[in-house]
Amino acid sequence: MQIKQIEGSLSAKDIRFALVVSRFNDFIGQKLVEGAIDCILRHGGSEEQITVYRCPGAFELPMVAKKVAMSGSADAVIALGVIIRGSTPHFDVIAAEATKGIAQVSLDTMIPVSFGVLTTENLEQAIERAGTKAGNKGFDAAMTAMEMVNLYRQF
């Protein structure tokens, strides 16, 4: 007996992407956006398939992601942002709530919402993960989004 295996392909063809990005730490967030767009274009997508929504901070990402997901205008949402630890507990609260909120949007709407939010100890780590030493997490989040859409389409 052969076991059936189902997985999503890495093709952006015919997928409508919504990039929801936090403006806080925008110089890094913009690199994540560029990485996500690069990924989509390299995998057969076009600029016409991409809409970028900008919100004030990481805390607002789940709200905007849910609004977009519920609108029916996107097949996948890619949440992008940067949260850098400071000297107060603010980092822990925002990182936890943004993470939980983004996951909840995907569960509530059954629209793939990929997580491309950097949570780093310092600015150097954030820069590394936005296209230098550690790749680009925006690119990675776009890969996840397209794979999940293509997986969902097989049900």
UniProtKB/Swiss-Prot annotation:
InterPro entries: LS, LS/RS, LS/RS_sf. It catalyses: (2S)-2-hydroxy-3-oxobutyl phosphate + 5-amino-6-(D-ribitylamino)uracil = 6,7-dimethyl-8-(1-D-ribityl)lumazine + phosphate + 2 H2O + H(+). One of its GO terms (biological process) is riboflavin biosynthetic process. Gene3D superfamilies: Lumazine/riboflavin synthase (3.40.50.960). One of its GO terms (molecular function) is 6,7-dimethyl-8-ribityllumazine synthase activity. Keywords: Riboflavin biosynthesis, Transferase. The keyword Glycoprotein does not apply. (2S)-2-hydroxy-3-oxobutyl phosphate binds at S87, T88, R129. Pathway: Cofactor biosynthesis; riboflavin biosynthesis; riboflavin from 2-hydroxy-3-oxobutyl phosphate and 5-amino-6-(D-ribitylamino)uracil: step 1/2. Pfam families: DMRL_synthase. GO terms for cellular component: cytosol; riboflavin synthase complex. PANTHER family: 6,7-DIMETHYL-8-RIBITYLLUMAZINE SYNTHASE, 6,7-DIMETHYL-8-RIBITYLLUMAZINE SYNTHASE DMRL SYNTHASE LUMAZINE SYNTHASE. NCBIfam families: lumazine-synth, PRK00061.1-4. This is 6,7-dimethyl-8-ribityllumazine synthase. The lineage of its organism: Bacteria, Pseudomonadati, Chlorobiota, Chlorobiia, Chlorobiales.
